[in-house]
Design a protein with these regions (language model features):
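Residues that scaffold, gate, or flank divalent-cation-dependent active/transport sites
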Residues: 189-191
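Hydrophobic beta-strand segments of well-ordered beta-sheets in folded domains
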Residues: 116, 121-127, 159-167
Length: 195
């Protein structure tokens, strides 16, 4: 029962998780065992096949009620974005201080909504996921972060500007992001490196 509750809470926090991600997070040894555990939870979770033919799970209505989740998730082609974010969560040691889509705003100057905001080794980080996003949108995001940096608001509040972490799909996109992020403290991962 505790394991079921923990799985439901993970789905509440991260929205969508693949079977392999759930295995890593909750020690579900072996594919058969993982499928059995997740099949026994069908009353609380729904699933669909992802791009790589692996099941992707999310809370259904009963599961949302059980853990007090108000966000409704259904089958979506954007699941890859959420899976990339979940892999970043696992890579950064399943941080309890992890918050998704937290708004940072300096009125009438700039607003930034990172995919996640978290603390790792006592340092704050912004996470941005680049899953099939148009590069001009990524450029706009970087420009907004640079505007936020230029205001000095976060530096005054926490003593420094948080490190930017990007997860992207290709080396060429990584290089372009590195170029644009010049002047910011940034780490850029390829998704395959952190899976």
């Amino acid at each position: 029962m505790l394991r079921e509750e923990a799985i439901l809470l993970s789905l509440k926090k991260l929205d969508y998780l693949s079977r392999s991600q759930l295995q890593k997070m909750h020690g579900l040894s072996g594919d058969r065992n993982a499928r059995k555990v997740l099949d026994n939870m069908k009353q609380f979770i729904s699933c669909f096949r992802g791009e790589n033919r692996e099941n992707i799970y999310h809370l259904n209505k009963t599961g949302r009620e059980r853990v007090g989740c108000e966000v409704i998730r259904q089958k979506t082609i954007q699941a890859g974005h959420y899976l990339m974010r979940a892999d970043a969560y696992l890579h950064y040691t399943a941080n309890e201080d992890w918050r998704n889509e937290l708004k940072f705003s300096v009125p009438e100057v700039v607003t930034v909504i990172p995919d996640s905001y978290f603390r790792h080794y006592s340092k704050r980080h912004f996470l941005e996921i680049d899953h099939l996003q148009h590069m001009n949108k990524n450029r706009e995001k970087v420009d907004r972060y640079k505007k936020l940096y230029a205001t000095g608001v976060l530096q005054k509040k926490i003593g420094y500007f948080p490190r930017m972490v990007w997860v992207t799909l290709t080396v060429s996109r990584k290089q372009q992001l590195l170029e644009w992020c010049n002047g910011l403290d940034v780490i850029i991962h390829l998704w395959d490196e952190i899976k």
